[in-house]
A protein has these predicted regions:
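Strand-loop microenvironment adjacent to phosphate/nucleotide-handling motifs in alpha/beta enzyme folds
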Residues: 1-182
Length: 182
């Protein structure tokens, strides 16, 4: 069964190009389209999708604002950013990833370049990864936020009390052998 995809872009031409690319692959099917974040928010609050392809610059509600609203209302979505602004290391890209986007592709400036094989291959590869990833949950994020608060409280206590009673100095080394579970 094909993965259900929502495409959000203010340009009708770009929506058409992205939908054509997605629908050309039997693994995916565009089931809905939106021209801005407000339309998309309405769709996402009523429907579930295997992946969401999201532009950044749009009227009424841009892509970053939509990500903020999804987080605020705890609406889970597997989001892939596709914008001329999303380049590796760009502030917009980092902001989107911090707000919950799972991955990104740099969308060429022209529809002609978007129809090129290199973009098509990269776009579909990224979409496949996003559509098959674990749906983000907000419980893990809340737990991490609580843990950060606990660490901050411990640091206040440690920094508040004098350390050396005997006059001896010690060196403590801490190490982590793992990270968050994937």
């Amino acid at each position: 069964m094909a993965k259900k995809i929502l495409v959000i872009d203010d340009s009708a031409l770009m929506r058409r190009v992205l939908c054509d690319i997605i629908d050309s692959d039997i693994r995916f099917q565009v089931t809905d389209r939106a021209k801005d974040g407000l339309e998309a928010f309405d769709l996402l609050s009523r429907n579930s999708y295997d992946a969401v392809v999201l532009d950044v610059n749009m009227p009424r509600m841009n892509g970053l604002q939509l990500l903020q609203e999804l987080r605020k209302y705890k609406i889970p979505a597997r989001v892939m950013m596709a914008s001329t602004d999303t380049k590796e290391g760009a502030k917009t890209t980092l902001d989107a990833l911090e707000l919950g986007a799972l991955d990104f592709v740099h969308k060429p400036d022209s529809a002609v370049d978007c129809r090129g094989e290199n973009f098509r291959r990269e776009f579909l590869r990224t979409l496949n990864v996003v559509a098959n990833s674990k749906l983000p949950t907000f419980a893990a994020e809340e737990k991490l936020s609580e843990e950060k608060g606990t660490v901050k409280e411990m640091m206040k206590i440690i920094n508040h009390h004098p350390v050396s009673v005997s006059g001896s100095k010690i060196v403590a080394i801490a190490s982590s052998t793992g990270g968050p579970k994937s």
